[in-house]
């Protein structure tokens, strides 16, 4: 199974990606996590994309496309995967289509998680993440508060409001998202791949709707070889 998750920030793509990974044995691929790691490590890429992400702007297509292409060209390329945060633009979708053709792979579905902007702002602005780069666990001041205010349950590190979780940044990111998403979804609708899902429902209901949209495929059962490899 090969999937793309589309949705604004705060729509729950990461959470649903985790559930899809657990059920179907997929590899989760998130460009946002890749870039945050590069920023934390102070790499050349991190220095390039850091200011853009801080302002709520999209990373240029050529940079994102190359990061993803390197992953798929490598010896351990993913065969079954769920993409979280890529492609985000029509140009990225075209580049990804070309990359998959070169690798003799094809997408099975594009899951579109829809949610109102104000709900996105409410969700993200309440998020607090562990400042420890080794940990990075995130909480929510209302929906998932830590046991001790301002302190990570996992490692005890301080919880902070990340720059890209501030309201002004969120609204800029939403503007960028809406500007690019119509053409992206039209591209995939023409291929018959889009499955629309209401992301305002409960996490369990959203996941059930995703499974329905995918035709309720059976859960993945690893072979003995795959079990030993893991």
Q: What does each of the following model-derived ranges do?
A:
Residues 1-230:
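Glycine-rich phosphate-binding loop of ATP-dependent small-molecule kinases
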